[in-house]
Amino acid sequence: MGGSSDSDSHDGYLTSEYNSSNSLFSLNTGNSYSSASLDRATLDCQDSVFFDNHKSSLLSTEVPRFISNDPLHLPITLNYKRDNADPTYTNGKVNKFMIVLIGLPATGKSTISSHLIQCLKNNPLTNSLRCKVFNAGKIRRQISCATISKPLLLSNTSSEDLFNPKNNDKKETYARITLQKLFHEINNDECDVGIFDATNSTIERRRFIFEEVCSFNTDELSSFNLVPIILQVSCFNRSFIKYNIHNKSFNEDYLDKPYELAIKDFAKRLKHYYSQFTPFSLDEFNQIHRYISQHEEIDTSLFFFNVINAGVVEPHSLNQSHYPSTCGKQIRDTIMVIENFINHYSQMFGFEYIEAVKLFFESFGNSSEETLTTLDSVVNDKFFDDLQSLIESNGFA
């Protein structure tokens, strides 16, 4: 179990000969929803030996990791009595947490954030934390519906297309409104963990986010200190991407749209995002940490984690943690739970997702063949080739 031949090593996957985080974003040719690819992904979730046997073909790393046979019952959750008399302070303020999601649409960011909340709630180390997701897309839809009383209007020109790079200012406005809502509710003690759910796909957007975090933490009027955690969600399995695009065609933007129109519009939207996307890297992590330390004038906490292909690909050499010398128990406990969630995601949740993808493609032979034909006509080899070209034009292949 866990072995594969060279002939199927990239079947249905995006290439992943790892030198840096950027190399994750590279497409290869192959069956978009090959049964062999999905079966292999299923086995990968079940087989801990897979990660050691395939380091060179997935993510090259010399750091081994123990995978528990029972990831839902991990040692850190046992025999622990929470010490509520030991709060952690930074700059004289009680700490709260902000998780910044990064990732292209249709990679699973929202699903993974809901799984993370479930994990935090089920662990005695963190079950007292109040968690809330702040989704920029939902804020956009709320504002749009309040303004025009309609779902998303599909555009015919680049000037009307919200997701066209020419209209970045509009997207940035919605993101800033969402971010300010997160700060407001954190400051009013309405939640303890705020998850900023947006693509956050450019260096400029991320720079703005952390400038705002610094401003919040150094503002004398703010009641709490935010500990930033970066969670990048990536997907380079063609079957997963295709399945996710199918599901996106049923979200709130497309409730009143025909299936084919929804698929075409979302595929176009995805190309726009690929044309601007810059993966978060360790260099950017270090730059942000230096920036925060300089502006907050203290050695501050900063953490970076990755979930790749529903957790099947091991991101060991990408993850990064910085604990200041004065880091308290609350931060260490919370990060330990999150890190454990990341390390065991494929076994805790990924297997179920991969099985759903397999069932989706297998079931078309018995039911909605027209739907699959429509999906194939849009999300095909040419579509993935176009995405690859966009990646290469950005210098991230």
Swiss-Prot record:
This is 6-phosphofructo-2-kinase 2. Coiled coil: none annotated. The gene is PFK27. Induction: By glucose and fructose, but not by galactose or maltose. The active site is at D197, C235. It comes from the Eukaryota. It catalyses: beta-D-fructose 6-phosphate + ATP = beta-D-fructose 2,6-bisphosphate + ADP + H(+). One of its GO terms (molecular function) is ATP binding. Beta-D-fructose 6-phosphate binds at R269.
